[in-house]
Amino acid sequence: MLPEGGRILDLGCGSGRDSLAFLKAGFAVNAVDGSAEMASAASELTGMKVEHATFADFEPKRVYDGIWACSSLLHVPAAELPAIVAKYAAALKPGGRFYLSFKLGDHDGMRNGRWFTDMTEQSFRRLIDDVEDLTVDCIEVTSDVRPGRADERWLNAWCMRI
């Protein structure tokens, strides 16, 4: 899906787990997280500089082959998602891939002290329909693999910049 050694933006990288996997697979990685603590932990884990910035404040300085937003953009209110997704889609090379995941559902609000925007396949497709030059490649609904959470469902989507 991505060229060998391609450049990936890990958007909302959390602990850096996925950034580390991408680095080990030979990709060039840039990572950013909105939590100073998580950005620091990710930097320590990966050995690379991880930027601390919100999705709204971070300005991509490169063009990417892929953007990985695993369980991260779900913390953006639904009303703000079109502008955020469009901003990052514009940082993709033509043919570049954008992975996004959301909890499956229709909730948009606070849950356990944090904001969550859940998505259905229909609401996700409507979101992407409003983003110029981005198309949905594949949507898959999966169960959470963490212990005790098999009843939680996730919407996983691969999009492509055209």
Short names for language-model regions:
Residues L9, S15-D57:
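Class I SAM-dependent methyltransferase SAM/SAH-binding core
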Residues A56-I67:
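A short acidic, Gly/Pro-enriched loop at the edge of an enzyme's catalytic core
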Residues G66-E80:
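A short SAM/SAH-binding and catalytic strip from SAM-dependent methyltransferases
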Residues P82-P94:
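A short glycine-rich, Lys/Arg-flanked "PGG" loop and its adjoining helix->strand segment in the class I
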Residues G95-F102:
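Conserved beta-strand signature within the Rossmann-like core of class I S-adenosyl-L-methionine
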Residues D108-S123, R146-G148:
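Acceptor-substrate binding/catalytic loop of class I
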Residues L134-V145:
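Conserved S-adenosyl-L-methionine
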Residues R146-I162:
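Core SAM-dependent methyltransferase catalytic element
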